[in-house]
Amino acid sequence: MSDEGSKRGSRADSLEAEPPLPPPPPPPPPGESSLVPTSPRYRPPLPAPLERIVGSGEPPVELAPRRKGEPLPPLPPSRLPGDQEVSAAGDSCEGPRRLPEVKLPEAAAGKGSPAEPEAGACREGERRGTGDQPETRSVYSSRSSSSGGSGDQRSGHQHQHHQPICKICFQGAEQGELLNPCRCDGSVRYTHQLCLLKWISERGSWTCELCCYRYHVTAIKMKQPCQWQSISITLVEKVQMIAVILGSLFLIASVTWLLWSAFSPYAVWQRKDILFQICYGMYGFMDLVCIGLIVHEGAAVYRVFKRWRAVNLHWDVLNYDKATDIEESSRGESSTSRTLWLPLSALRNRNLVHPTQLTSPRFQCGYVLLHLFNRMRAHEDVSEDNGSGEVVMRVTSV
């Protein structure tokens, strides 16, 4: 009993020692709403520019970020001017309302008010909210402009497809005049003159590779010596050219010496000497050999010269004339008559004679004999194959 009485006495003493609790604040008048909460909420300010947080007339003040575990600073006095309006509850950003003046201890007045960051954050949110609409408009305008640009690009491509272009460089008329040199039609109808001449020099033929039409060209003039280009020649052509050049030099020298020995008064003793008479005969025979060599190899050298001339001449390609083409085809005129230069393979193949086009009686007799021998050999092979029970067909070309 004494213990319980002592405990009750100590509890009563402690209750008397504690100060009394302050009375609750009076309710606000009906015209004003209680905007300041009993436990003030403090949110860390957003990283906004200093101009937005601080007024235009005050110097910028840097706000130190709150560290983790640090207690919240006390609420500073909200000493705002009478005409300044802020939004209630910093995160609601509703219509402008006035805050009632609340007096707080002076110790917390020097630490800065967190209401200003909240007001700045609210203004920043309002500015962001108001800035969303122009941004959306700009995005929409950029999309519309991009769609319009793509539409213009498509229309430009379609317009470009309708325009005639060169079938070699795929460029339009801005790179030069477009010609129609052959029977080709459609997208491969036109070409530039320079592109066609370069393609002819690279390909080595005056014939279109698509319609096999031989171009109508005319030579204008020779290029300048500084613009001359070399052509590719084979080893056989080099030997032929060297043989023709050396034979020509020997022929000129020997004929000059023979004429001087025959008509000069200073060569009377040479004409009477037997050794010089033998030399005259040998030189005459060598001159005949050189003449035959020049005649035999002169055609090949002349073809090489025509190729070189074709590369180093300025040519003019004419447009295709359908009436002229029909007239030439009706007359049966060969297109090789107007060919200025052909590749070596075409020139060599043109000189060959097909066995079905032999018109000489001598060639006809030889062809008949070869045909008879081949038929006899075919009969022997067939009889041997029939004995083995197998049928073999052999085709022999003559």
From Swiss-Prot:
Residues 19-31 have a biased composition (Pro residues). One of its GO terms (cellular component) is cytoplasmic vesicle membrane. Zn(2+) 2 binds at C182, C184, C208, C211. It holds the Pfam family RINGv. InterPro entries: MARCHF11_RING_CH-C4HC3, MARCHF4/9/11, Znf_RING-CH, Znf_RING/FYVE/PHD. Zn(2+) 1 binds at C166, C169, H192, C195. Its EC number is 2.3.2.27. Changing Y367A: Abolishes interaction with AP1M1. It is a multi-pass membrane protein. Pathway: Protein modification; protein ubiquitination. The chain crosses the membrane at residues 241-261, 274-294. A zinc finger (RING-CH-type) spans 158-218. Residues 1-14, 94-104, 121-130 have a biased composition (Basic and acidic residues). Changing C169S: Abolishes ubiquitin ligase activity. GO terms for biological process: protein ubiquitination. GO terms for molecular function: ubiquitin-protein transferase activity; zinc ion binding. Predominantly expressed in testis. Present in early developing spermatids. Not present in spermatogonia, spermatocytes or somatic cells (i.e. peritubular, Leydig, and Sertoli cells). Present in early round spermatids at step 4, remains until step 11, then it decreases at steps 12-15, and diminishes after step 16 (at protein level). Also expressed at lower level in brain. CDD domains: RING_CH-C4HC3_MARCH11. It is found in: Cytoplasmic vesicle membrane. Keywords: Cytoplasmic vesicle, Membrane, Metal-binding, Transferase, Transmembrane, Transmembrane helix, Ubl conjugation pathway, Zinc, Zinc-finger. A motif (PDZ-binding) lies at residues 395-398. E3 ubiquitin-protein ligase that mediates polyubiquitination of CD4. E3 ubiquitin ligases accept ubiquitin from an E2 ubiquitin-conjugating enzyme in the form of a thioester and then directly transfer the ubiquitin to targeted substrates. May play a role in ubuquitin-dependent protein sorting in developmenting spermatids. The RING-CH-type zinc finger domain is required for E3 ligase activity. Interacts (YXXL motif) with AP1M1. Interacts (via PDZ-binding motif) with LIN7A. Interacts with unidentified fucose glycoproteins. This is E3 ubiquitin-protein ligase MARCHF11. The lineage of its organism: Eukaryota, Metazoa, Chordata, Craniata, Vertebrata. The gene is Marchf11.
